[in-house]
Amino acid sequence: MASPAAGGVVIVGSGLIGRSWAMLFASGGFKVKLYDIEQQQITDALENIRKEMKSLEQSGSLKGSLSAERQLSLISGCGNLAEAVEGAVHIQECVPENLELKKKIFAQLDRIVDDRVILSSSSSCLLPSKLFSGLAHVKQCIVAHPVNPPYYVPLVELVPHPETAPATMDRTYALMKKIGQSPVRVLKEIDGFVLNRLQYAVISEAWRLVEEEIVSPSDLDLVMSDGLGMRYAFIGPLETMHLNAEGVISYCERYSEGMKHVLSTFGPVPEFSGATVERVSEDMCMKVPDDPEHLAARRQWRDDCLMKLSILKYQMQPK
């Protein structure tokens, strides 16, 4: 458990991502202040966190070594930003994905923080150079992009501004490890970071295969969930290459020409419109109707699966 000397953490924004971050930091023993401009949103968020933590404790899925009550005691709400950030060592911004809104928040923070606190954004796609340029504390700024839902999916992409101090990256990396996340260092900024670039590449080819009537939407998803996805839940594409031959060099010697031939047949970026949208939507809605009730139930099932998978991954760590 983190000692009081370790300082506190501030979450700016009390939506789903903000609540998830609050729970994660509390699981690591950190005192957390949840800031929002609306007191009712803070009240609702704290109640949501209480229910979620109690449910996790009952199912044996609560993170960390502290009880739910102890973790909950570490989380408080605050409607005054200056008061919230006093004594903080890490501030995690979690407002909606709007560049001007995020820049406004960081400009406010820039005026009131000291030279030690880390200013971190949860942005999934906004480049650090767009978010942080011009700030007096730019060396302390970094993007820490979580994967939804962060409590069950541990990856966090750490993306620096060109002026981010190496110590900021190192401290953020250590902090993410301390609360049980799996941080990766993105060495320089790039559109989409790493996760979304990989995700969009898969979505793009998946869309083309459906659009060209190579495979149905439901069978396409099955290729991932019962094929590639099962493997990738434990090892990545590069280790897959390594294991599917006698190492990476052997794999490239054997399969590079075949890979290049297939890759040369890939088409342009899809438009994601027209008849294919209707076809994919119809197929998905047969499986999960797109009304709020069915979508919420399916998301809960997804989260339950991810929770159990995270337990299995922990149990199956290589020796």
From Swiss-Prot:
Q: Which GO terms describe its biological process?
A: D-glucuronate catabolic process to D-xylulose 5-phosphate; fatty acid metabolic process
Read off the Pfam families from this record: 3HCDH (PF00725), 3HCDH_N (PF02737)
Activity control, per UniProt: Inhibited by malonate.
State a single Gene Ontology molecular function: NAD+ binding
GO CC terms, sorted = cytosol
Q: Which domain of life is it from?
A: Eukaryota
Please provide the record's keywords in A-Z order: Acetylation, Cytoplasm, NAD, Oxidoreductase, Phosphoprotein
- In this UniProt entry, the residues modified to N-acetylalanine are A2
Modified-residue entries (Phosphoserine), positions: S3
Uppermost EC category = oxidoreductase
Tell me where in or outside the cell this protein is found.
Cytoplasm
EC numbers: 1.1.1.45
Binding-site residues for NAD(+), renumbered to this chain: L16, I17, D36, E97, K102
Expression sites by tissue = Widely expressed, with highest levels in liver. Undetectable in skeletal muscle.
Q: What reactions does this protein catalyze?
A: L-gulonate + NAD(+) = 3-dehydro-L-gulonate + NADH + H(+)
* Gene3D superfamilies assigned: N-(1-d-carboxylethyl)-l-norvaline Dehydrogenase, domain 2 (1.10.1040.10), NAD(P)-binding Rossmann-like Domain (3.40.50.720)
Q: Which InterPro entries match?
A: 3-OHacyl-CoA_DH, 3-OHacyl-CoA_DH_CS, 3-OHacyl-CoA_DH_NAD-bd, 3HC_DH_C, 6-PGluconate_DH-like_C_sf, 6PGD_dom2, NAD(P)-bd_dom_sf
Family membership:
Belongs to the 3-hydroxyacyl-CoA dehydrogenase family.
Record function comment: Has high L-gulonate 3-dehydrogenase activity. It also exhibits low dehydrogenase activity toward L-3-hydroxybutyrate (HBA) and L-threonate.
Q: How does it assemble?
A: Homodimer.
Q: What is this protein called?
A: Lambda-crystallin homolog
Which species? Mus musculus (Mouse)
Read off the lineage from the record: Eukaryota, Metazoa, Chordata, Craniata, Vertebrata
Q: Gene behind this chain?
A: Cryl1
